[in-house]
Amino acid sequence: MLLDKLEFIENKYDELSVKISDPSIMQNQNEWRKLCKEHADLEVIVNSYREYKKVVEDLKANKEMLSGESDKEMREMLNEEITDLTNREEQLETEIQILLLPKDPNDDKNVFVEIRGGAGGEEAALFAYNLFRMYTRYAETQRWGVEIMSLNETDLGGFKEVVFMIKGNGAYSKLKYESGVHRVQRVPDTESSGRIHTSTATVAVLPEVDDVEIEVADKDVRIDVFRASGNGGQCVNTTDSAVRITHLPTGLVVSCQDEKSQLKNKEKAMKVLKSRLYEQAERERAQGIAEDRKSQVGTGDRSERIRTYNYPQGRITDHRIGLTLYKLDTFLGGDIDEMINALITADQAEKMKLMGNTQM
């Protein structure tokens, strides 16, 4: 029963409240921080559950009062309160069910975002740049940091490929739904006849992983160094500071040339490689677990066409949830929270459905 689980969580929360106030436990800072985090994680659920119990109690009391009340005005007032309390009870039930969903262990992590121009040549590269700008501006609104890992520009200012890191609490929880193929429909600046072209760009969002989560043996990698290049391939560095790492067992290749130091580029490239290997392992694991129950909201299939950006109509359509927004300019300017929140809600609804009957 869900109520039994909530009672267990509340008791656990009370135990932790006592422990984190214990001076003997506070002396062990690592243990104390761990308990504080566990306490904070449970606090939201416990607060909602305690409010739920109070609402149920008040609802019962008002119904009892109503059954013995003959005064018309008092009955009207009690009926209003019962309606409000019933609505709040339903809201809290949904809220608690969502809070009890299994938490993605990567949700609080920083992310690596990889954007590559796909079908459409130069126009696809320009669209890749548009997406990069959209995500970096969104990161600014969230007060997240952005750090470019590698960049391959075209002569017209588009991006053949860009890999960058977004640092901030909850970055993966919001951006993980962006992985997939993004399609743009617009008239290119170079198109004299005014025909609408369709181009694509691929986005991959990878959680940053700790060294302890993924180990890469020296024998499994080949490291090449070369000179960094800028627009159109011209050399921008006189030393071999750029680094390319090839993971021999999988064939994955990562390049980094953003730093002037070869050592720093190697460290950055290795971070990206570990995140790619982690994502690959997680994807294979998830496919094994959910082979026959594909989730409505994908968070990892790079070949899945997830969204269309239609310039003539000023619209964005997410094909996974069928949501269309008519605010293309502000969306590409970083105003993407409405879409992200809709994807999170759809994902939560799908998970609740898979959990089966969770009535309180």
UniProtKB/Swiss-Prot annotation:
User: Which top-level group of life is the source organism from?
Assistant: Bacteria
Q: Please give the Gene3D superfamilies that the UniProt record associates with this protein.
A: 3.30.160.20, 3.30.70.1660, 6.10.140.1950
Spell out the residue ranges making up region: Disordered. Answer: 285-305
Q: Which InterPro entries match?
A: PCRF, Pep_chain_release_fac_I, Pep_chain_release_fac_I_sf, Prokaryotic/Mito_RF, RF-1
- Spell out the disulfide connections: none
- PROSITE patterns xref list: RF_PROK_I
- What GO terms fall under cellular component here? cytoplasm
Give the record's PTM text.
Methylated by PrmC. Methylation increases the termination efficiency of RF1.
Per UniProt, subcellular location reads as: Cytoplasm
- N5-methylglutamine occurs at which residues? 234
For this UniProt record, the keywords arranged alphabetically read as follows: Cytoplasm, Methylation, Protein biosynthesis
| GO molecular function list | translation release factor activity, codon specific
Q: Which SUPFAM superfamilies match?
A: Release factor
Quote the function comment for this protein. Peptide chain release factor 1 directs the termination of translation in response to the peptide chain termination codons UAG and UAA.
What family is it from? Belongs to the prokaryotic/mitochondrial release factor family.
Q: Which PANTHER family match?
A: LD18447P
- Write the protein's name: Peptide chain release factor 1
UniProt lineage: Bacteria, Bacillati, Bacillota, Clostridia, Eubacteriales
